Amino acid sequence: MRKFDKVTFFALIVIWSFQIFGAIGILFWNRQWFIDMTPLTLIMYFFILFHKNWDDRKKVTFLLLTFSWGILAEIIGVNTGLIFGSYEYGQTLGFQIMNVPLVMGIIWVVTSLICGTIASQIKVRTPIQIFIAVSLMLILDVLIEPIAPKIDMWSFDHSSGGAPLSNYITWALVALPLQTYFIVNRL
């Protein structure tokens, strides 16, 4: 099991603080300003989490694979409806390529890194750590799905009444190889 160093621990505290401050800001202060800052905040999280990993070949490989795998899944998904269901992205997440905000790749990297790191701290066998990491990613997806359309991040076809069950199943399946790579390589 890897231990958190002080810098990583501080980085996670900063990220959680921004999340709490952002939620409070959206609920009680200038909602639109906080929503507009979402892409910038996600990019900041990315750099906070990878601040000391640019010389680690395995971590850079993980970053590139995760970004590419996540963007590819989203491009196929949003343009065909085959992977996650019928959905589209709004304007909140910023610049889009092939109908997918570029920041979605960063979201896949950040959530994969955080969930994999948490799971890797638990003293259980590798397959259980992978299961925990994928489950944490799935929990994040379940929590964000009802909020995303309200802040124009993405929305599913209105006839489906929200995210279909297949979205959650395939989200876990897309996350599985990422978490397997992360846990097996002890990143």
Regions found by a protein language model. Give the residues of each.
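Aromatic-rich, lipid-facing transmembrane alpha helices and their immediate juxtamembrane interface loops
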Residues: M1-L187
